Amino acid sequence: MKLPLGLLMICLGLTLAKGETNLPPVFTQTLNNIILYENVTVGTVVFRLEAYDPEGSPVTYGAIGADHFSVDPVSGNITLIKPLDREEKDTLKFLVSIRDRVDPEGESERDNVVEVPITFIILDLNDNPPEFQNTPYEADVNEDAAVGTTIFDKITVKDRDIVGESLDLKCLPQQQSPEACRKFRLHIIKRDATILEAAVVLNDTLNYNQRMVYHFQIEATDGPHKTQTTFEARVKDVQDKPPVFQGSLSTVIDEDSPINTLVLTVHARDGDTGEPRKIVYDLRTNPNDYFLLDAQTGELRTAKPLDREALEDSTGIISLVIRARELVNGVPSDDPLTSATAKATVTIRDVNDSPPVFNHKEYSVSLLENTLPGTPLALDMSVSDADVGINSKFALRLDDVSGVFDVEPKLVTGYSQVNIRVANGTLDYENPNQRKFIVLVVAEETDTNPRLSSTATITVSVLDANDNKPVFEQESYSASVSEAALPGQYIATITARDVDSGSYGDSGIRYSLSGTGAELFHVNEQTGVISLANCHDNGESNRRERRDLNEDEHVEEDDGEGHLEMLSMEAATREIGTEPTVQYTLITQAPEEQASSVPLPAPVPHAAPSGVPAATANDDKAPQTCLDYESETTYFLSYKATDDNGRGSASVVSLRISVTDANDSPPVCESPLYRASVDEGAVVFDSPLIVKARDADTMSRISYRIRGSEQVESIFDIDRETGQIIIRPNATLDVTNLNSDQLIFAVEANDGLFTAHCGVNITVRDVNNHVPNFEQQSYSAVVEENSEIGTSVERVHATDLDTGKNAELRYRIQQGSFDDFGIVETTGEVFVSRKLDFDRRNTYQLQIQASDQGTPSLTGTATLTINVQNSNDKDPYFVPATQHAEVRADAPPGQLVYTLIALDPDVANHNALEFAGTDDITAIDKEGKELPHYDQFKEYFKISRNGKVSVNKQLDRNLFAVMRINVLVTDSTAPNVQQGRGLLIIQIIDVNKNPPRFNAPWSVEQPQIKLQMVEEQPVGTVLTTLQANDEDSSIGEFNISDNDYFAINQTSGMIYTIARLDYEVVKEVKFQVTVSDTGVPALTATADVVVDIINLNDNDPKFSQSDYYFNVTENSPRGTVAGKVEAHDGDVGVFGEITYTLIGENNKYFSIDAYTGNVMVANSSILDREQIKELTLSVVAQDKAPAAVQKSATATIHINILDVNDNAPVFTRDVYNSTVAENAAYQPPAALLQVQAIDQDEGLYGDVRYIITAGNEMGLFKLDAQSGIVYPAQSLSGKHGAYELTISARDTQGSGTMESTTKAIITVLRVNRHKPEFVIPALSNATIEIPGDIVQPDYLLLTVRAMDNDTEENGKVSYHLQVNNRNEQQTGEFKIDEVTGELRAKTQLNRKNRANYDIILVARDAGNPPFESLRLLSVSIVDANENRPEFPDASNPYKVSINENSGRDVKIGHIQAASRSKHNRDIFYYMLLGNEDGAFYVDKLTGDIYTNKSLDREETDVYTLYILASIKADLHISEEERASFSIKTLNRDNTVAKVAITVLDVNDNPPVFEKPIYYAGVNANAKMGAAITLVNATDADQGKNAKIEFMIVASNLYKFGATKSTGSIVPSPFAISQDGRISANTIMAEYNQDRFELEIVARELEQPQSSASTKVNIWVFDGTQLVRVILSRPPEEVYQEQEEIIAELRNATQHRIIVDEIRFHLDSIGRIRMDWCDLYFHAVDPQTQQIAPVDEILKDIDRNYDYLKDYYAGFAIENVVPAYIAIVQDEFDLAVAGLVALVIVLFVGVISFIVLCCCLKHWNLSVPVETRRKEALIKKQIIEDLNTTENPLWIEQKLKLYEEQELTMQVFSEPDHISNSEAPGHLDHRSSLEQVHHVGQTVDNTYATIQPRNNQNRLTGGGGAGGGSMRSGGGASAGGVGGAGLLLARVDPHMNEFADYATLRNNRAPSLYEFTGSTFQAPIRDGDDAVAELI
C-alpha cells in the first residue's frame, strides 16, 4: 500500500513542477480486508467507493475482474450480484478504478485512470448441513456379544462450516426395528465443529431368534441443520438356546400298577437347530420317590407301589419336575443355556380301598308333631368316600321300621350333605308310640366288589304343637243397634271352642274385631261380649264440636257461655279468567235467638254464596252418638278368635251389624252453586233453571224461596214446591240497566227444622251487534331509514259501541309489514320492529285490522301508508376484501396491472368512489421471507383515483416476489367520512430459462442410474438419495413414476421402499424420477433408474395345509399309504429344494418318503381304534440351504383309525340323581339333569337316542331324545317328592339293536323364595348412640330383628356378624345371639379410646339354598352429659295411617323424645321436612300429630315427615335452612323422628270408561263365544274399592236400513266378562247387516257401588264387506299405531273405520311372516250408519292419493285390497253351446276358404302378425312376487318393474265405438264387465288395463284370443299406471273361504290375467255367490 502512494506523490510532484500537469483522482478510503458475511443477499450494496479529483472534475468508478460484484460508475456503490459461499472461496480480490475527466467535452485519452486492488474477506456462517462419509454403514454381530462391544467404528461426519455448534449424533428407531436404539448406542470417538468420528456399541443382549437384522437412523446435527443415514446390524446365531421339551407331559396310571410300569416317555431337543446336541434327563422333584427316570431314553417308570389316598392332593395328581441337559463334550451341562426343566403331571387312577364314612356316629334332633312331610331334620350330617370315580359311588338308605323318615340323596359320589326328611304319615304327640324314633342310616357302595359300607344312628324326639283352631258354632252372625245408641250399649255375645288344652284350648282364646268401622265397636277379648265403643273425647272442659255438615265448611264452636259462634265461609269462583271472591261472616247468637233466627250473609257483588251450602238446625239437643244411619247403614266385620292367648291359630267368621234410622238429617243442596246464562231481553231461560235440595229423611218436605236484593226479586221468581226459577212476566233484562252482567243471590231450602242456602249465579249475556270503526280509513306516516327498533311510527284507533268483551278491541297487521313493523295489540301503536333498509324497500302499505272479543268476533280495517326516507349511512367496501393480481417481472412502467372493485349501496354513480393506496406496504422475497419496510416499495406501483393499478417503476423480482398494498376507498358524497379498507396482493411472475440437472453419473446424454438392493429389506429402507441443481432457480420437488416398490421424498430426493422386495417375484425394478424447479414456467429433468434385486434364502418352506387328516382302517398292513403331504419353498435353486422327515412320539409306527411326502404304515400293531382313535405325527420340511441359513417348517398329521360297529351304548351311571326346586321354569323349560350313554362306535352306529320308558305316568317330565336332557313338561309347583324314571338308550339314532337302560331319580324340593328383611334397624345405614363414657361388658345395645316371608325352615332367621366375609357370632368388641338377635358389648367400651364402631349385621335363613341380608350399623358412644333430647329408636320410623277425606284436627299419632339430662327439661317439637303442602301439624308441647286439612289418597298416598325434638321453646327454622337439610343426614340424627303416614283408601271415586262410545263389528258367521271387542273402565280407588263388574243393561237392535231401534233384545245376544271382553252369546247369522247399540254399565263391588256407563255400537257384517291393509310391520307395532292409521283412513274416506282383526301375514308360499301383518276393517257411513261397499272405500282412497301418499311410508303400508272378491259361475247350457260352436265353425270355414283363394296369387312368406302378438303377450316373463298393490296410492316407486311388459304388449280392443281418443269419463269401469265385446281388432295401448275374462269363460278353458275378451283402458282407466298383478281363482260357489294362494301361483291362469295397471274394483253382478281372495 505504501508503494502506490509513494509513486502517486512522485507523479504529483512532477506535475506541480511542470505547472500545467492534470493531477489524477485520489481514493479517500482504505480498500483492503473489507469484511462480508457469506449470507449477504444478492443486490445488497456492500461498499461505497469514495474519491476526488484535485482539479474538481467529476469522477467515474469501475471494476476489473469482479465476478461477484458490480460498481455503480456514478455513486461508487459496490453491489453483490452473485451469492457468496465461504466454502468455495473465503477471499475475493479484484481491481477498482477511478477516472477523472480532463476534457470538458467528454471522455478522452488524456483522462487520468487510477486502478487500485480491493480485498473482501468472507466470514463463515453455519449454512451447510453435516455430511456422512463412506456410507452406507453396516456390521455383523454375534448374538452372544457382550454388552459394550464395539460393532462398528467407521462413522465419520464432516461439516464444511468452521463456525457453529459441535457436531452431535442421535439414534432414531425405525418402525420395523423399534427397539434398535435400545439394543445399540452411539459412542463419540472424536468431535469438533468440523468433524466427528463415532462407533456403534452394543447396549443390550441380542437374540437371533427374536430378530436377525436391526435398522436404525443415525442423525447428525450441527445445531440448525440435520442429516440422516441408515445403519444395518445383522445378528449372527450362536449356540445359546436351552433344550426344548416336545410332546405331552401328562399321563394317567392305575393306583395298583406294579413296579417298573412305564408311565410316559419324555422327549426334548436342543433349542439350537443348527448343530443340535444330545440330551440326557433327570428328575428334580419326585414326591414320595414313586418314580425312576431313564437318563438316556427319557422313560419314566414306577419305583414302588402307589397309594392315591396318601397324597396331599385329593385329585390324585403328582407333579414332577424333569430336567433336560445338553451333552457338551460328552458331559451334561448345568448352565441355563444348555439345560431346561418342565413339569410333568401323573394322575393316579383310583382303586377301591376306602369305605364311606359319616362325620358322626350318632345324631339327635327334636321336631314338632305338626311337621309337614318333606321337612328336613336339623342335622349336620355328611358322608364321604376318599376314593374317586365309581369307587366313590355309594347309596344311602334308612333302617326305619316306622317308615316315617326318608334320606336324600339316595346316591352319592365322593361327598354329600345328608338330609333326613319326614317322608309320610302324620306325627301325633298324643300317641305315646310316636314320641321318639331311633333310625339307622346305612351308606353302602354300589359299583364295587366288595361293597364297603358304614352306619350312623339318629334319635328323633317329637314335641307337642298347637294343631287345632278355635271353632265357632255358626258360619256367620248378625246383630242390630240404633244410631242413637250411646257408648257401652250391649249388642251381642259370640264365643268359640278349641279342643286343645291349656293355653292352646278354650282358656287361651282371645276375641277381636276387624274391618271398616270396627273401631266403633268394642269386644271383650276374653268373654266375647260386643258393645258400642266410646268414640268421643270428653276430657276437655269446653265442648268442642266438629260436626261434618257438608264436608266441614260450617263449624260451630261453644265458648263455654252458651253462645255459639257460626263461621260461614262464602266462596265463589267466577268464570275462567277471574279471581275467586271469598266472604267470611261471623254471627254470634244468644241461646234464645238460636231457634228463631237464620243468619244470611248479605250479597256481595261478583261473589257467590257459600261454595258448599251451610245448614242450620233449630235444636242442638240431639244426643251425640257414634253411629250415623245416613253415612252407613250396615257394617260388615270380621270376628276373630285366636288361641294361645292371641298368639296361636285363629278362626274368623263374618259379623253383620245393622244400624236403624233416626231423624237427624238437614236438607242438602244438590249443587252448591247453580249457574245459568240468559241473553238480554229474553223472557225465559234457554234451559229450565231448577234448584234442588235433598233430605235424607223421607218424611221431610222442602220449600224454596229467593233471598237476594230487590232488583233480583223484581226480576226473578221461584216455584216454592219445585224450585224452578223463572223470569217475571213484566221484568226487562237490559245489561245497561244492571250494575253487573252477573246476578248473584241465594235460594233458601227449608224442611221445617233445618235450612240450607243454595247459591245462584245468573249471567246476562250482551249481544255483539256493533263492528269496530277506525277514526280514519287511511293513515300515512314517514320514517327515517336509520330509525331505531321500537320507534313509534303512528297510532291508529277504533271504537266499538258494544260493552264488555264485545267492546274490547285487539289490533293486528294483516299484511304489508314484511315483518319490518309491529303493532301493540291493545293500543294500536305501530312501531319499527326490524332494521329498515331503503335499498331493500322504501314504501309499505299496511292493512290493519281491529277485532272485538265477542262471539262471533266482528272486525274493521284501515290502511296505513309508510314512506321510508333514505340516508347515506353505509360505508363503501371492497369486493372481495382481499384482491389478487399478477404481473410479469419484465412488465414495463405504465402497464395496467389491475382495477380495484368496490361497492356502496348508497351511491348511484360509481364515480363517487375514490381509491388510494396507503403507506402500509409489505413485501415478500422469492424465498418466502417477509422483507422489512422500505420507502421505495411505494414507488413500484401507482393507484389512480378511479382504482386503476399500474406499474410505476421497473420491477426487480430478486428484490421482492410478492407485494401487499393496503388500499382505501372513500365515498366522496357522504356527509361524514365513509371509507372502506382492503388488501391488494400483487405477485411478481418470474421467467424461467434453465432446467434442473441430476448429479453425476446422470447426464442429459446418459440419463440412466443403476442401483442394487438386497431382497426382504423392511419397508422404509432407503435405496439412495438423488440430488439435483438448477442454475437460475431452486429445486422444487422430486416425483417418481408409478411402481409397486419404491417411493420418493419430494423434498429431499430420498428413494425408499414401500413394499417387500422378493427376488422370487421380481428380480429387477425400473422406474423414472423427475425433478422440477420452482421457476415459471417450471422446467424438469428425468432419470431412468434400474434397481437389481439380490437373492437371499428368505422363504420358509410352506406346507399346503397346516394340518393333514388321513384315514387308516384297523390292521392295515405295512406299507399302506395313509396320505401324502406337500410343501413348497418360494426360493430359487437349492434354497427351494425340500426333504421330509417325521418326528413325534408315534413316528416309529409310520414312515415318510423324503422326496415324495407319502406317509406309510410302518408298524400296524398300534392300529386298534378301541385303544387309540387318532394318532398325531409331526412332519418337518427342510430346504437344502447351508445349515447357517437353512429354513424349515412343521405340519401336523392326524391319522384317524376307522372303526366297525361292535359296541352297545353304556350309561355313565346306573342311577342319575337330581334335586330341583318346585319353581323350576318350564316355559322355557329348565334343564333338570342329563343322562349320557357312551357308544364306543363312531358315526351312525355311535349316534344314541334316549326315551323315557317308565316312571313318567303323570307326564311331569320330558326328555330330549338327542341330548339326553330331562326338562319339566309342566309346572312342578306343589308336586314335592322323588320321581324315579327309567330311561333307555339305543344306538343308530334310536333304530339300532343295541340298547341299555338307567334310572333317573328327580327330587322336587320346596323353594326358599324370600330373603330375610331387617325390621330393626330399619335404615340401611343406621346409627345408635350409647350414653356414657364407658360401656360395661354384656351391655344390651340393640335387639336385631328380621322377618322372612317363607315358612318352616325357609323362614327361620338366625343372626350373625360379618367379619372378613365370614359369619361370626362375635368380634373383638361385640357379640350377637344367633336366635334372639340381642347385640351386646363383649368387652368394656371406653369412649376415650374409641367413640365409633361400624358393624355389619347378617340375617340368614335356614332355607335350601339359604338367603342372607346385610345391614350396616354404626355404634357411637356419646358423652353422658349431653342433654339434647333424642328419640329412643330414631333409625326405626314411626308408622301411622289415616283414612282419606278425614277432617281437620284429627289426631293421627304421637311421638316422644327423651332427654339425657338429669333435670327433666321441657321438649319441644318442630316440623322440618315433608310437610310442604301443610297437610299436618305437630303439637309443640305434646308431640301429637294432627291433620291440617282433608287428605286425598288419589293425590298423595304416603307422607314422610321429619320432626325435630329440641329444648328450645322459640326455635325458628328459615326456609333456607330447610332447603339445606339432607335426608341422609336426618336419617342418622337421633334428634329427628321420621314419621311415615299412609293415607288409606276410601271408596270415593266412581269408575270411568276410557271412551264415551265404542265401535266394533262381528262376522255374521261368528260362533257363540267369539270375541268382539274390549271395553276398559278404571277406578282411581285402590284395592277392593277399585274392583268393578261389567253388565249389559240394554241391547238395542237397529235392523238394516232402520233409523229407530226395535227395542232391547232379551236375553242379550252378547255377553261381557269381568275384564270387559264382549263376546257373541248366540249365532249371529240371523242379524246379518243389522246393528246393535249396547249400553254397558261398570259398577263397583263395594259400597256405595258407584257406576258409569258407555255405549258400544256393533255392526254384523259379511266377509265380503272387509278391506285388508297389508303392513310390513309386526302386529304389536300396528296395535300401538292403530288409532293413527284409522284416523288417516277416516280423513281420506270420510267414513268411520272399524278394525275387526289384526293377524300375521301369509307370504306367497303360505308361510307366516312374523314381521308383517294384515289389518281387516269395515267402513261405516256416518249418515246412514250402514256398512259402506268395498269398492266405494277403494275409490275414496284413490281420490285422496296425494293426501295419503305421505303417510304410507311411515305406517309401512304395502297394500290396500279387498279381503274378498265375488266371481260369478254362470250356468252352462251344453246344447246351446254346441249349436253356437257349429255355426261359428261353418262361418269361419267359408270365410277362410274365400280369403285363401284371394291371397294365393299374393303369397308372401312372413311371420304372422298374430304370432308376433302372442310372443309379445306370452314370451315376456311376468314378475309375480311383487309387494305392489291394486291401489295407485302405494305404487309410486314401483312402476319400473312392469315397464318392459307395459311397453311391449298388444291389447285387443273391445267395442268398435271405443277409441283411444275418448276421455276417461266416458268409460264405465264397473258396468263394462257385463258387456259382450267383439274380438278381432288390435290397438297399441302401452298403459292398458287387462281385466278378468268375460263371465262365459272358465279359467281352465283354452287360451288365446278366442278364449275370452279384453277391453282397452285407453290409457285412461281409473287405476293409473303400474301396480301388482291380479290373480283370480274359481272356487266352489257354495264355499265361503279364502283361496289357496299357493295353488293360484302353481296353477297359473293364462297370461291375460297376469297384469293390471288399475285399482281393483269389485265387480257388481246379480247372483254373485263365489268368493276368492285377492292376493
Curated annotation (Swiss-Prot):
Coiled coil: none
SMART domains linked: CA (SM00112)
Feature: compositional bias, Basic and acidic residues: 537-549
Residue ranges with Gly residues bias: 1900-1916
Entry-linked InterPro entries: Cadherin-like_dom, Cadherin-like_sf, Cadherin_CS
Record text about domains: Three calcium ions are usually bound at the interface of each cadherin domain and rigidify the connections, imparting a strong curvature to the full-length ectodomain.
Protein name: Cadherin-87A
Source species: Drosophila melanogaster
Gene: Cad87A
